[in-house]
């Protein structure tokens, strides 16, 4: 059997090792850039999804917004 492999050693080369992905840790991750908060999504909202039709802004208005004069601390 070793003679057989010896004859075809030119065709059966050693396979290159797959490149390992570089591990990412917290120090490599920065603050979000150009982040715009649009809405809060609760667990009940996951099953309903977005209504078909209408613009994205109209769909987000149905989620509610921030009322002027009420801080998040008061909520």
Curated annotation (Swiss-Prot):
Annotated keywords: Cell membrane, Cell shape, Cytoplasm, Cytoskeleton, Lipoprotein, Membrane, Palmitate
Keyword Membrane belongs to the record: yes
Alphabetical GO biological process terms: regulation of cell shape; regulation of Rho protein signal transduction; regulation of signal transduction
Gene3D superfamilies according to UniProt: CRIB domain
One MF term in the entry's GO annotations: small GTPase binding
Residue ranges annotated for the CRIB domain, each copy included: 29-42
Subcellular location: Cytoplasm, Cytoskeleton; Cell membrane
Gene Ontology cellular component annotations, sorted alphabetically: cytoplasm; cytoskeleton; plasma membrane
Mode of membrane association: Lipid-anchor
CDD domains on file: CRIB
Lipidation (S-palmitoyl cysteine): 10-11
InterPro entries: CRIB_dom, CRIB_dom_sf, SPEC
Main location (coarse class): cytoplasm
Transmembrane segments: none
Pfam family of the protein (one): PBD
Family note: Belongs to the CDC42SE/SPEC family.
Function, as annotated: Probably involved in the organization of the actin cytoskeleton by acting downstream of CDC42, inducing actin filament assembly.
Name of the protein in question: CDC42 small effector protein 2-C
Protein's organism: Xenopus laevis
């Amino acid at each position: 059997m070793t003679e057989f492999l010896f004859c075809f050693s030119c065709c059966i080369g050693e396979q290159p090792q797959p490149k390992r992905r570089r591990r990412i840790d917290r120090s490599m991750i920065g603050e979000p850039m150009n982040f715009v908060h649009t809405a809060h999504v609760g667990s009940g909202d996951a099953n309903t999804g977005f209504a078909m039709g209408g613009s994205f802004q109209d769909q987000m208005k149905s989620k509610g917004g921030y009322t002027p004069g009420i801080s998040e601390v008061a909520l």
